[in-house]
Amino acid sequence: MNKHQKPVLTGQRFKTRKRDEKEKFEPTVFRDTLVQGLNEAGDDLEAVAKFLDSTGSRLDYRRYADTLFDILVAGSMLAPGGTRIDDGDKTKMTNHCVFSANEDHETIRNYAQVFNKLIRRYKYLEKAFEDEMKKLLLFLKAFSEAEQTKLAMLSGILLGNGTLPATILTSLFTDSLVKEGIAASFAVKLFKAWMAEKDANSVTSSLRKANLDKRLLELFPVNRQSVDHFAKYFTDAGLKELSDFLRVQQSLGTRKELQKELQERLSQECPIKEVVLYVKEEMKRNDLPETAVIGLLWTCIMNAVEWNKKEELVAEQALKHLKQYAPLLAVFSSQGQSELVLLQKVQEYCYDNIHFMKAFQKIVVLFYKADVLSEEAILKWYKEAHAAKGKSVFLDQMKKFVEWLQNAEEESESEGEES
């Protein structure tokens, strides 16, 4: 069947839809209305909030969200890169914006409230505002130092009250910002403002949720991406909590790697001497304390075996396995605190793995005989340093052995007095 050309109406004028007709002029109309309203409200931020609330029904905030936020922050529409589009025409700009505000926490916090109210009223602006802040952080080079400081304070306060997610910080990892030192400098100001709103635990928790806790070193150029450099920079800036947090994160990462490598070596049944040398090198290289290492060793040793599910057989299996690795544990339990950590680890393991409940005392006695644990450590654990998990069961198991230790100690003391 042949396709016939559709007839065309001649002499008919098609009316342009009203929306399409004025779209061309809307950005400037939007800007002019916003600038005029902000200038009329002046420094009265309550009046600004009311103006923005009521004007949302007349202006298309959804379509021109970037213009809205550009003007509220910078006082003008911004071109790509961050330069002011209307820099030469003061009638198209306003001085009643974040960048023109006083550089103090309370003033910027009041501006943050304007954004909070606006986004609560027009929920659809939430994502647009997040995108705007990511964009503004990319434009930092175009802003003056004072403007950068105010933007950092605003960002920190909004992160603190939950208006913004920590993911906006990914913009700071841009090469140009990092190389020129802008990223680190901005981050310090931002974190100070954030911590003025929330405690350090809340801040670090947000960083973890956004998977940024492991990326903080990226605020610095590659040749300065060390924990020591980060710690000094942030501690000197009065943010020791962040320095400590990063050290802990790095230490946890190091421990995970060490545990993985140890697990591999134990599964390959490497000679104990080799394992000792490897662990000592890692301790020195990563500044790891013995108390951390002894816990890792215990975990790795216990993970190296498929344990029997029968309670009456597992104790014998455990003693045979632990006797083999007692010399390894002995090397890294040379301090009283390390011995207590090991005792608590054994206690927790036996409590968490029910088949081991009755094996606790036998394991402790084995370690005592193998010079892994001293009587001083065992007595201290018994009297005051035991964990809460299953303590009544384990203290009862240990009662006779502890009495024997105490009697032996008394006998040796009396023999010393006689001689």
Curated annotation (Swiss-Prot):
A GO cellular component entry from the record: cytoplasm
Record carries keyword Transport: no
Its domain of life reads Eukaryota
Q: Which residues carry this modification: Phosphoserine?
A: S412, S414, S419
Keywords in UniProt for this one?
Answer: Acetylation, Cytoplasm, Phosphoprotein, Translation regulation
Pfam families attached to this UniProt entry: HEAT_5MP1_2, W2
A GO biological process held by the record: regulation of translational initiation
> Where in the cell?
Cytoplasm
Region labeled Disordered — which residues?
A: 1-22
The chain positions of domain W2 read: 248-415
Tell me the residues on which N6-acetyllysine occurs.
K117
**Which SUPFAM superfamilies does the entry link to?**
ARM repeat (SSF48371)
Q: Which residues cross the membrane?
A: none
User: Where is it mainly found?
Assistant: cytoplasm
Say if the entry is tagged with keyword Magnesium: no
Q: Which InterPro entries does the entry link to?
A: ARM-type_fold (IPR016024), eIF5-mimic_regulator (IPR051245), W2_BZW1/2 (IPR043510), W2_domain (IPR003307)
CDD domains named in the record: W2_eIF5C_like
Quaternary data: Interacts with EIF3E, EIF2S2 and EIF3C.
UniProt similarity note: Belongs to the BZW family.
The job of this chain, per UniProt, is described as: Translation initiation regulator which represses non-AUG initiated translation and repeat-associated non-AUG (RAN) initiated translation by acting as a competitive inhibitor of eukaryotic translation initiation factor 5 (EIF5) function. Increases the accuracy of translation initiation by impeding EIF5-dependent translation from non-AUG codons by competing with it for interaction with EIF2S2 within the 43S pre-initiation complex (PIC) in an EIF3C-binding dependent manner.
Protein name, entry field: eIF5-mimic protein 1
